[in-house]
């Protein structure tokens, strides 16, 4: 009865195959490990992973005690301890991950198998709408995942897992937990979670969390030492600008160097608006029309040999005052809540959840300048995000004799991101997005060939506003279809996959819209055909050692910030100009990896090389305007390579 009920529910929701993972019997055969960080084997079937990702076998996991030990407020800082992974530096409250020197548009961030379709890739100071308190597992792929998710994951991906939709029964009919935490330098917070289950089919889950930080303390001052050096500030005008220090340095005539006081200055000082520097002269006479030469008055302050000018320096004053031993404007406020309902049967599950996430925080460092929001030149900057998301997920095992399992993932979210200068919104991003992913895995063919077929699509409607908006409103649609197969020829395994995709950007520009200047003023709708393919050969002579050679090729469509930015981008203190003439970016990578796991001992070695054609990057133009240096998006060929050892 349970099986037929769930089949009916799923067939109503789906008219095509769905995507999923191994069945419960296979999961029980999964090899146990005490390591908190492991490399996922193709034979280790996780309830959360898609089957195609297990076939690619590229991910490392962080979970359990290790995750609790390294977890911070941001995703980037949490995963930065992994070899080859760093974090962008926008303070303790905003840090996107950087994988092998790549970030932003090339590194995907996914929650429960769906990409986060937000605007944090546009600017590193923008928040990622995820409450790290609720994350219980992280998977990291340092290799390209463009085959599964498109070009936005061509440089790798970070997968976040939480229990917003329950897929397994809790041990008790009613269970929960309440936590409180606090520290002298990381704020205070707490969380609550409660689960209700009838022990047969249904689970209802409620959870919430909050976090507050007033400021972060540091051992020294918050700015670089040169910003407090009187001599360096006096000698370098650009340094005073970068440090946002008001320090006037100017010269005037030295009265003691001039023997005479000008009679012409005495008579015409007011009429000709003459300055104090015009008062003193080396001439003993001044000429007046109709009168002739007139003797100048001797300067009683005159001292022969004195320098002709005097340097004046005002005391340095920081535009935004900050106390020693603390990061200014480093506050954080966040809260989140989730409610979900799951139906679990013998052959799979179906779940629905609603999540609300709110956060606001200061951007430490320097305030924005020359913004249109206020006449006052410098104001502290803060960022806020409000995100509401609906998730629906389902999985069905053994949908047909020739199908292993199928599953689907869907989310709808509404998000509002604001960059605030003082209390006024400088840039506002309102986003509505739909995301859908379907995947079906077939049963093994000839007991050797495993594979999966998938479809995914993203719809993002971005509307921009604000005094300093540097992007137009854009509607983006992205679709992709992929197929991956793995042939087991023990001790060898051959894996291959191919993806075909399409991306479209449609502008929504009012008639009186300010298109900016430079190359960013040429705004036009664009569409791109994309693709990706993967070929990998694994050699596992013994269970504890795997050697793998892998090649990935992908074509990434340019993102909206690369195409359409056209004005001051205050997060980077630059003027940014996009280029809507861009074509796709090609990346071709090859990687050799070795993984040895014996008990609690793990040894990992990765050697990689990636060649880019049409790599998109910001280039300095040599021009400076009110917002700072002008940078234009450009493309070039690029090679990256490296060696990682853990």
Predicted regions and their residues:
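Signature of Gram-negative outer-membrane beta-barrel scaffolds
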Residues: 449-546, 550, 557-558, 568-570
